[in-house]
Amino acid sequence: MNKEKKVDIVGKIPKWAWLCLSLLSAVVLWFFLSKNPTTSLSFPPLPEVFKAYHTMAVERGKFWPDVLASMRSVGIGFVLGFLFGVPVAFLMAWYRPVRFILEPWIQFVRNIPPLAYVPLVVLAAGVGAKAQIVVICIATFLTITVTVFQGVINVDETLIKAARVLGANDTVLFVKVIFPATTPFIITAVRLGISVALTTLIAAESTGAVAGLGMRIKALSQVFENAEMMFYIIVVGVIGMLAEKILKFFERRLTSWQEKREI
């Protein structure tokens, strides 16, 4: 009974209030970390972090070119990874020989940090934007392939058998059964893929980038401009959160037929 009352009380508090409480908690924690001699270098005062926007965007004119350069690399790399990953995942799930040939290598490369194969990519693709896109594409491809593959092989076998009994061929089975049932996994793969693309930025932009969020974070850390570096780190996090919110919005629209469970 007490548990039910607690759940009801939590449910009555609007989400915006929880968001405000979360932000307030983060600000308070940041304040104490910025005053602690042990952590003050890693967490400069928030006013200095906010001032870093003026420093990087207005005084130096670096911020927006960095954002555009990174979004270009992330966008192209993610799209290529998605376009390659989804078909490969379906082929692996549908044809066992393809699975037996590709799956060991996908699992092998997936466990290698992107930073480890950056030198190989640079040797093959050269220095610059092309190498960045290739690194992000590889990381995204691996994540999307594994996620979508798991979705396809977990489609209810009863649905497939029922469609076969009704005379569905492979094309009809894919369009009417497999693809709709896998849609939630594809959306999850997109969300994970974007997250992986953003976290791969620093590794990707170590290939000789002249602009970019990841490159700038690394450059600022080398000269100990901690406030500016922290500002860029926060920007990467904000971009990831915005992408997550947008994808959740479309997920609710595309998978409204699914039963939802509040946690």
What are the language-model segments listed below?
Residues I9-G11, K35-V79:
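Periplasmic/extracellular loop-to-transmembrane helix junction in inner-membrane transport proteins
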Residues M1-L24, K245-I263:
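Transmembrane alpha-helical segments of polytopic membrane transport and secretion proteins
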Residues Q107-T143, Q150-G151:
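Generic hydrophobic transmembrane alpha-helix motif, especially the helices
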Residues R96, I153, P184, M230-I263:
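C-terminal transmembrane helix and the adjacent membrane-cytosol boundary/short C-terminal tail
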